[in-house]
C-alpha cells in the first residue's frame, strides 16, 4: 500500500500540473467568448474568416511538417550513422531551437527578413515580396507567399529537434550486421531496395511520430503566425 501510494502521489502532481493550466485556460476562454469550445466549433462557419483560417492553419501545418521531416532526416542520418567528436554538444545545439521561446524565435526571424536584414541583403525579400520573391508570387498566384515561406522556415527551425530526437536514436542503435545481412539478399543489392525494404520499415514509426508531433506544434502555433504572417488574417 505504501509503495502504491508513494507512486501515485508524483503521478497525481504531474497530472495536476498539466491539467490545471489547461482547465483554467478553457475557463478563461469561456468567460471571454461566452461559449464553450464545442459551441465555438459548431458556430465556426458563422465567423466571416473562420473556415478560411482553419483551412490555412491545416495547410501550413502539413507543409511545415513535411519541410521539417525533409530537413531533419538527413541530419538524423548523419548523426546516427557516423561518429562525431563532441556529439553531445551537437545534439544540444540542435535541440536549442525547440526550447527557445516562440516570441524570441519570431523576433529572430523578423530580424532576418526585415529591410536590411541578412536575407534581404542577398536579394531574398520575404517581407515586402520584391525581386525574386515577388516574381515567384506572381508566377504561382499566391498572395503573401513570402510571409508563408518565412512561417514554414520558422516552424521547421523550431521543430527540427523533434525529428532528430525521434529518428536518430533508432539509426544509431541499429546493429550494422542487420544491414550487412540484408545486403546479401537479392532484394538488398540496390540502394533503393535497401531504403524501401529495410530502412523504411525500421524507421517508419519514428518518422511518422515526428511528423505527427511537428504537425500538432505547427497547427497550434500562434506567436510565429502572429508575427511572421500578420497580413494573412
Regions found by a protein language model. Give the residues of each.
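Membrane-water interface segments at the C-terminal ends of transmembrane alpha-helices
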Residues: 2-34, 47-172, 198-230
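Short hydrophobic, aromatic-rich alpha-helical segments embedded in or entering the lipid bilayer
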Residues: 35-42, 231-233
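General structural signal for secondary-structure boundaries
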Residues: 37, 46-47, 185-188
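Polar/charged alpha-helical tracts
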Residues: 39, 121-124, 183
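Generic anion/oxyanion-binding catalytic loop in active/binding sites
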Residues: 42-43, 192, 226
